[in-house]
Amino acid sequence: RFAKIVPAGNFLVVTNHKYKDLVLQHIPEIGEKQVLCEPIGRNTAPCIAYAAYTLLRENPDAEMIVTPSDHLILNEDDFRTIIGECLEFADRHDALLTVGIKPTRPDTGYGYIQVSDDHTISKVKCFTEKPDLELAQTFLQTGEFYWNSGIFIWKVQAIVEAFRKYLPEHHA
């Protein structure tokens, strides 16, 4: 789905060593240098930092789309439109963006994002990681919360600066 947004030559995939061959098999348009193998599995932030610093060396003006590999996207046209709007916004504002999904039910399997207003792109008030059912029901009723999709968009320089400022242990 991202090949219609970004040329495959610009992809970077961060994965575990044991999945490298599988990634290359499933995405034949990319080369081995585009698959970054985590030295140690340590969650999302180190993977993002690894990709960001790799990309920073090659293209400091680049934008990044960070996405899990297992999303179900039913309307790819709408998805591409949203990603395009986010890329434009991130480019103009050096902002760190996350894509929220309007919840259809209370669900304890997702993290939630509370937004500050009802605009298409709005500031995040807070993140809540996988609430209990009662809190998820409250979130749904307020209309201020979205499921956290795990999709993030930013300029590489903006995320590197965020690592420097907020997670210096991941700043190279």
Language model features with spans:
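Short beta-strand segments
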Residues: 14, 65-68, 98-102, 128, ...
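A short acidic, often aromatic-flanked loop/helix-cap motif at beta-alpha or helix-coil junctions
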Residues: 41-46, 105-107, 133-135
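Generic beta-strand structural signal
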Residues: 62-64, 95-99, 108-111, 149
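Generic secondary-structure signature for well-ordered alpha-helical cores
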Residues: 4-7, 28, 53-60, 88-95, ...
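Conserved N-terminal catalytic core of the sugar/cofactor nucleotidyltransferase
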Residues: 1-66, 74-80, 84
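Catalytic core of tubulin tyrosine ligase-like
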Residues: 110-172
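Conserved donor-nucleotide/metal-binding helix-loop-beta segment in metal-dependent transferases, i.e.
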Residues: 72-108, 118
